[in-house]
Amino acid sequence: MTTNKTAKIQFYEGTDEPVVPEIRLTRSKDGTTGQALFLFEKPQALSSITDGEITGMRMIDSEGEILTREVKVKFVDGEPIFLEAVYIWKNTPDFDRFMRFANSYAKSNGLGYSEKK
């Protein structure tokens, strides 16, 4: 099921993930490289109603799609509870593009952004 949000995340093509993740960013000292860690607790993508294999995480907005294949499932007491995805950028244009997605995703989901001091 696709929503009318301007920015969304999908693990299965055409199916928006309704669970909003915790997102943590880290960057190199010069700011050119870094990563975004997405942590989804009990995402719909792991529920029994979803079928198929998760092959990546798609970040979709009005500019297009950013894809990462770095996706892991974390189990607690034998149950899949967390989905963890990592997006790595290797240059400033990739970081700028990611931040435009992140800002759009935040607005679509009523979220804010704060820097660690």
From Swiss-Prot:
Pfam families: Psb28 (PF03912). GO terms for biological process: photosynthesis. GO terms for cellular component: photosystem II oxygen evolving complex; plasma membrane-derived thylakoid membrane. It is found in: Cellular thylakoid membrane. Part of the photosystem II complex. Belongs to the Psb28 family. This is Photosystem II reaction center Psb28 protein.
